[in-house]
From Swiss-Prot:
GO terms for biological process: translation. One of its GO terms (cellular component) is ribonucleoprotein complex. PROSITE patterns: RIBOSOMAL_L33 (PS00582). InterPro entries: Ribosomal_bL33, Ribosomal_bL33_CS, Ribosomal_bL33_sf, Ribosomal_zn-bd. One of its GO terms (molecular function) is structural constituent of ribosome. Keywords: Ribonucleoprotein, Ribosomal protein. The keyword Ribosomal protein applies. This is Large ribosomal subunit protein bL33. Belongs to the bacterial ribosomal protein bL33 family. It comes from the Bacteria. It holds the Pfam family Ribosomal_L33.
Length: 62
C-alpha cells in the first residue's frame, strides 16, 4: 500500500519556549494534519495559548 499524503504534525507555542514569566508553567501544543505535497515547509499558525493567555504563533516541531 502507498503511504498517505496527509501527516500528523505538532504545533508548539513560540513565546512559551522563550518566555519564562507567564501565567502558568508549561508549553502549549496542538496537533493537526497537513498535506505533505502542498505544504512542504514547516507549518506556522496563530492559535490560542492557554499558558500565555493570548493568541500566539505556533510552529511545527518534529
Amino acid at each position: 500500500m502507498a503511504k498517505g499524503v496527509r501527516i500528523i504534525v505538532t504545533l508548539e507555542c513560540t513565546e512559551c519556549r522563550s518566555n519564562s514569566n507567564k501565567r502558568s508553567p508549561g508549553v502549549s501544543r496542538y496537533t493537526t494534519t497537513k498535506n505533505r505535497r502542498n505544504t512542504t515547509s514547516r507549518l506556522e499558525l496563530k492559535k490560542f495559548c492557554t499558558h500565555c493567555n493570548k493568541h500566539t504563533n505556533h510552529k511545527e516541531i518534529k
